[in-house]
Amino acid sequence: MYKTPIVFLTYKRPEETKKILEIFLKIKPKKLYIFQDGQKLDFNKNEKNKHTQTTKIIRNFSKIKAKKFFFSKNICQKYIGFKILNKVFKHENKAIILEDDCIPEYGFFKFCDLMLKKYVSRKNIAHISGCNLYYGTSKKKIIKEDYLYSKYPHFMGWATWKDRWNKYYDPNIKDWPSKK
């Protein structure tokens, strides 16, 4: 059983959602939080259908225990992550975060878990990312290292700690005037 809590944010990708839920069945997370954002008012028929399918998939997912949250209104991309992680971090000290457009390899979870443990006392490290943007167009590695430090966050399959979340993440960037 996988011990680090996992947060999964879904929207309107039914096929990807199914694939990710299959991965969860294999890794068996001890704690799984699933959030479904609400529909936008201007959704076309196809988007409404995909959103409805995704919601049904989540509602029917019962093979492992999960806390499920469904938003009746669309929160919007800018705020949904902040809203859900603020909720999760009332109960957890760390978490792995996935959206429905990020289908991870199994090793991603072990990598995040190891890095969360390794860097727990390094307060200048805000998060661990499983995003791999460092390949060229030929799919050949641009960098030789297995992982790197970056001052730029990559929010495509990532993990963080409660204290870092509370310190570094602000959707309104209130301290921007002092950082310019």
Placement of each model-derived feature along the sequence:
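Peripheral/terminal regions associated with large enzymatic or DNA-binding modules
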Residues: 1-98, 102-180
